[in-house]
Amino acid sequence: MSTGAGSGTTKGGRGKPKATKSVSRSSKAGLQFPVGRIARFLKSGKYAERVGAGAPVYLSAVLEYLAAEVLELAGNAARDNKKTRIVPRHIQLAVRNDEELSKLLGSVTIANGGVLPNIHQTLLPSKVGKNKGDIGSASQEF
């Protein structure tokens, strides 16, 4: 007395319906970062007695956004240096050249990141010929 293969039930409506495919919370939220794992970390970390259902989803979205932002800037830095692989140096250049990320990660040390190239203005050679010519021509006019 089966009603058919596509109906989802057996014995004329009696019995258990066919199990549906489980869908992860990450795919429901449209994220790549693992919502379930972050929920587990929040619960086991004892940050609070209870953890709301939306908290791990929101935190996953924030972490995914930050990772995508850093990776995009680091990829641009790698391309500028004619490299196809992102190394810690590219991440350092990306973070330190971006004002907001530099403020967020100000106290963070990136291993093998190096330093930003910077030469103080007073140490650079000045344009001696142009400056003296301007001063000399102004004094000649008086």
From Swiss-Prot:
So which tissues is this one expressed in? Expressed mainly in roots.
The residue numbers the entry assigns to motif [ST]-Q motif are 139-140
Keyword check for ATP-binding: no
Q: Which is a Gene Ontology cellular component entry for this protein?
A: extracellular region
Q: Does the keyword Lipoprotein apply?
A: no
Q: Where is this region: Disordered?
A: 1-28
Q: Which CDD domains does this one have?
A: HFD_H2A
Gene3D superfamilies per UniProt: Histone, subunit A
Which residues lie in Gly residues bias regions?
Answer: 1-12
Query: How is this chain modified after translation?
Result: Phosphorylated to form H2AXS139ph (gamma-H2AX) in response to DNA double strand breaks (DSBs) generated by exogenous genotoxic agents and by stalled replication forks, and may also occur during meiotic recombination events. Phosphorylation can extend up to several thousand nucleosomes from the actual site of the DSB and may mark the surrounding chromatin for recruitment of proteins required for DNA damage signaling and repair. Widespread phosphorylation may also serve to amplify the damage signal or aid repair of persistent lesions.
Record localization: Nucleus; Chromosome
Q: Which UniProt keywords are given for this protein, alphabetically ordered?
A: Chromosome, DNA-binding, Nucleosome core, Nucleus, Phosphoprotein
Residues with Phosphoserine modification: S139
Q: How does it assemble?
A: The nucleosome is a histone octamer containing two molecules each of H2A, H2B, H3 and H4 assembled in one H3-H4 heterotetramer and two H2A-H2B heterodimers. The octamer wraps approximately 147 bp of DNA. Interacts with numerous proteins required for DNA damage signaling and repair when phosphorylated on Ser-139.
Q: Which family does it belong to?
A: Belongs to the histone H2A family.
**What is the recorded function of this protein according to its Swiss-Prot or TrEMBL entry?**
Variant histone H2A which replaces conventional H2A in a subset of nucleosomes. Nucleosomes wrap and compact DNA into chromatin, limiting DNA accessibility to the cellular machineries which require DNA as a template. Histones thereby play a central role in transcription regulation, DNA repair, DNA replication and chromosomal stability. DNA accessibility is regulated via a complex set of post-translational modifications of histones, also called histone code, and nucleosome remodeling.
Which protein are we looking at?
Probable histone H2AXa
